[in-house]
């Protein structure tokens, strides 16, 4: 099982999380960003949040469109949101699984 790095964005109203393949790949992407590179860095084009909306730990669920728009404004594409989280967030931890509320990551997240 491969490991992933959790990137944590401390939001004004809601904290948001994305999962990247590694810090090294994120650093490379940020030096010369492109959608092609982003797809190599982030396997799931989805945004998550803790159940209570705060912090980087605990059970994660899908971030709603409203939660994401409250943090970044309306009309942002998922690629733009993930880019902003990678740029303005911080690597929080490395994990070997993506367990979220309702099963594995990839269900019902903002995408």
Curated annotation (Swiss-Prot):
Domain of life the protein comes from: Eukaryota
UniProt record, GO biological process: rRNA processing
Region (Disordered): 89-111
Comp. bias intervals (Polar residues): 90-99
Alphabetical UniProt keywords: Cytoplasm, Nucleus, Ribosome biogenesis, rRNA processing
GO cellular component: cytoplasm; nucleus
InterPro entries per record: Ribosome_mat_SBDS_N_sf, SDO1/SBDS_N
Major localisation: cytoplasm
A Pfam family assignment: SBDS_N
Compartment(s): Cytoplasm; Nucleus
Function field: May play a role in RNA metabolism, rRNA-processing, and in a process influencing telomere capping.
Misc. comment: Present with 2430 molecules/cell in log phase SD medium.
Family, as annotated: Belongs to the SDO1-like family.
Protein name, UniProt field: Restriction of telomere capping protein 3
Gene that encodes the chain: RTC3
């Amino acid at each position: 099982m491969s490991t992933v790095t959790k990137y944590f964005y401390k939001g004004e109203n809601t904290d948001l999380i994305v999962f990247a393949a590694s810090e090294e790949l994120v650093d490379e992407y940020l030096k010369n960003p492109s959608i092609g590179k982003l797809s190599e860095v982030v396997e799931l084009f989805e945004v998550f949040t803790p159940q209570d909306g705060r912090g980087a730990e605990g059970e994660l669920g899908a971030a709603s469109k409203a939660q994401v728009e409250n943090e970044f404004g309306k009309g942002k594409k998922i690629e733009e949101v993930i880019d902003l989280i990678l740029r303005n967030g911080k690597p929080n931890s490395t994990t070997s699984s993506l367990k979220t509320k309702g099963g594995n990551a990839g269900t019902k997240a903002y995408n």
